[in-house]
Amino acid sequence: MIYQEENQHLRIGLASPEEIRGWAERTLPNGEVVGRITEPYTLHYKTHKPEKDGLFCERIFGPIKSGICACGKYRSIENQREYSKICEQCGVEFTESRVRRYRMGYIELACPVTHVWYLKRLPSYIANLLAKPLKELESLVYCDLFLARPIAKKPTLLKLRGLFKYEDQSWKEIFPRFFSPRGFEAFQDREVATGGNAIEKGLASLNLQIVMDRAYMEWRNLTEQKSTGNEWEDRKIQRRKDLLVRRMELAKNFLQTNMKPEWMVLSLLPVLPPELRPMIELGEGELITSDLNELYRRVIYRNNTLLDFLARGRSTPGGLVVCQKRLVQEAVDALIDNGIRGQPMRDSHNRAYKSFSDLIEGKEGRFRENLLGKRVDYSGRSVIVAGPYLPLHECGLPKEMAVELFQAFVIRGLIGRYLAPNLRAAKSMIQDKEPIIWKILKEVIQGHPVLLNRAPTLHRLGIQAFEPILVEGRAIRLHPLVCAGFNADFDGDQMAVHIPLSLEAQVEARLLMFSHTNLLSPVTGNPVSVPSQDMLLGIYVSTIRSNRGIYQNQYHPYDYRNKNFSYKMFYFHSYDDILKAEKQKQINLHSPLWLRWQVDLHIVTSIDREVPIEIQYESLGTSSQIYENYQFRKNRKEKILSMYICTTAGRILFNQQIEEAIQGFFEVSQHRSRPLPAIIA
């Protein structure tokens, strides 16, 4: 937690070993430094009291009961004398028990351990920075392979280079004759590395600026290359370019945040406060505990065993030490993310342990359940339904919800107009739902934007601003086109409504967050508000035309007995004539018809050189050329006298709606009597 300008905010990132030690280590009033956990014990099996230097140690995490030490002595917390702050016998501070909710401990690992999130999660940050295959790094992390010359800049005695197996270490039988035990250990750490130690040395030796420059040079060379014509090779080159871009971004982020890549390898393991991984006593002395305690115990057991092996020196076989390092790595992996490598660790009942990742991820995790799901004032929640009649920037707010959200504004309006003498009378009028309330409410919400949010808010478009209008019912009405930004649909989804109170918040909502100003994706730049699902189906149904079109009045081979099968196509001169005929049931939405069109307008057709279906000549020399979607009437000099296009009433209505949205309703109503400049034919 970071405190800056009296505002608390949370920053998640890599922590250095010094930071981890600073979280946990404390100096007691008697000068003793506590914080390191060395014993894998929790509670004593008889007394059920925390074991010293264990996972519930009161010296490290604080007393279980406020003001009472481990040996049962009581001191007043308000007494600030120096000798009363700590028990001289057990070393427990006389303080409040709530400190056990935030005081941490740490485990000093006998060997560096790679953080499994940065190794196994995709993309693998460690593999990206080291430019090594993930399988090769996994074999190195879990001690299946050894790395010779881990620090390339230093001179070495061995001629080995790169990776090799444990069986290839013939030098281990020769070099001990020329070194003292300590000298041989120093030589071995310098020349050969495996496990997290090898990864740590490789990351520490990186120059991030050089990594960025080399990745950029290679990316530029690949970009300048022309296409090979081979689809497989082009895909391979594109994948390589994407990898280089990710490497440059990763190195840039490390440089900007002043974090070091070697911090992705743990040498100190933080231990959560005991109140966050409790052990509870049930009846008859039975205990239930968090899975994290069992996983921490396994780490400490294996770490202490490795410490014993290393303390014995050369008397311990090298293969045993290597095997124990792998066990420590696997124990830490299970603690952080159990099952990420395949088969998870299980208890005696064959139940997989819940790791740290299981506790924080998902809908019921620590972040979404406890930190992000808080209720706030001036907010509400309801189901969303479609409101296709609404403009893009408006939403339908139920009256029952609006009067609660804007209650403070309504009360101010009632008292300001002397309709209510005091606060109590104004609230009584609102509860009785007097008619004057709705009038004032309409005035209050006019020009006052509201914020709609749909959880989870994964990107900027997850919360947008709208102008509210009052609607009946209890559901929030929303235009279907804005659902894509929220990733919402009308199958029972809920949305939260928030009221921006300050003038600054309202201005920000109006200028930056209105839905009609967020039509493009901030990530890709592609349109977000596009028709989909029932909108596309409705547009298709309203603009569909009979399959036979102008051929309906020709002989039909399947209905030769039906003499009334021939269909007469009507001719119209304006939009209004078509709409009147449709209302009078003379035509339907899908009936083909001829609409008079302006001669000087160009007709777009899918056929470049279309041949007329029929040509009719009249006695005065005029002629009519009939095509599939339009027809001309010409004089003797081939001058076009009139033109008609084949369309439907449904397409006329659809085109009219588009024009009203673009030009405005009043402008369209003034020019509706004459043919409009565009139509779907």
UniProtKB/Swiss-Prot annotation:
The keyword Zinc applies. Coiled coil: none annotated. Keywords: Chloroplast, DNA-directed RNA polymerase, Magnesium, Metal-binding, Nucleotidyltransferase, Plastid, Transcription, Transferase, Zinc. Pfam families: RNA_pol_Rpb1_1, RNA_pol_Rpb1_2. Its main location: plastid. InterPro entries: DNA-dir_RpoC_beta_prime, RNA_pol_asu, RNA_pol_N, RNA_pol_Rpb1_1, RNA_pol_Rpb1_3_sf, RNA_pol_Rpb1_clamp_domain, RNApol_RpoC1. Binds 1 Mg(2+) ion per subunit. One of its GO terms (molecular function) is DNA-directed RNA polymerase activity. Mg(2+) binds at residues 489, 491, 493. It catalyses: RNA(n) + a ribonucleoside 5'-triphosphate = RNA(n+1) + diphosphate. Zn(2+) binds at residues 69, 71, 87, 90. It is found in: Plastid, Chloroplast. In plastids the minimal PEP RNA polymerase catalytic core is composed of four subunits: alpha, beta, beta', and beta''. When a (nuclear-encoded) sigma factor is associated with the core the holoenzyme is formed, which can initiate transcription. This is DNA-directed RNA polymerase subunit beta'. The gene is rpoC1.
